[in-house]
């Protein structure tokens, strides 16, 4: 089956573990979820046929939950518990770890300078963003007023783009979240946590941008 003309966001939702595959190749399936696989591969100078072959293998596995057809209220409840609450736990701990690593290893050329600052910025942006969703947008959608939420949704999508840009800065600061050979246990644990946070945030944004928001605007 050919996947190259399908949007990344759709593939990430319909094929188990496709999101992890796209992350491996640094392909943006959340904020850039509307671009086709062929276009995304061309931009990264990747072999689209090889990626299609990997997707074909993944597509043979059963999908755990197809959020594309789930009720909107169920999607919202899932987003809050699985992503919003998780981000609120993850980021303060990562900020503490980054502050410690930057202080203890300040003399090492490989130290991720500015990481605590960028994680703090992401934490502040997401805290405000998630509160607006939970207090304003999500109740509108649950009350069947999603088709009238074009303004709030466009703001949320813009803030998703801002978060995506901060993730790119964090990846650049951390050598694509790769610890150097001399990294201590805290440093390695922090990078594992950052990778998990990035995976969670990309899945979170993808579910909103590619499923919840379009269906809400369509009047479901």
UniProtKB/Swiss-Prot annotation:
GO terms for molecular function: metal ion binding. Keywords: Cytoplasm, Iron, Metal-binding, Stress response. The keyword Iron applies. It holds the Pfam family Hemerythrin. Its main location: cytoplasm. GO terms for biological process: protein repair; response to nitrosative stress; response to oxidative stress. GO terms for cellular component: cytoplasm. InterPro entries: FeS-repair_YftE, Hemerythrin-like, RIC_family. The keyword Transcription does not apply. It is found in: Cytoplasm. Gene3D superfamilies: nmb1532 protein domain like. HAMAP family: RIC_YtfE. Di-iron-containing protein involved in the repair of iron-sulfur clusters damaged by oxidative and nitrosative stress conditions. Homodimer. Belongs to the RIC family. YtfE subfamily. This is Iron-sulfur cluster repair protein YtfE. It comes from Citrobacter koseri (strain ATCC BAA-895 / CDC 4225-83 / SGSC4696). The lineage of its organism: Bacteria, Pseudomonadati, Pseudomonadota, Gammaproteobacteria, Enterobacterales.
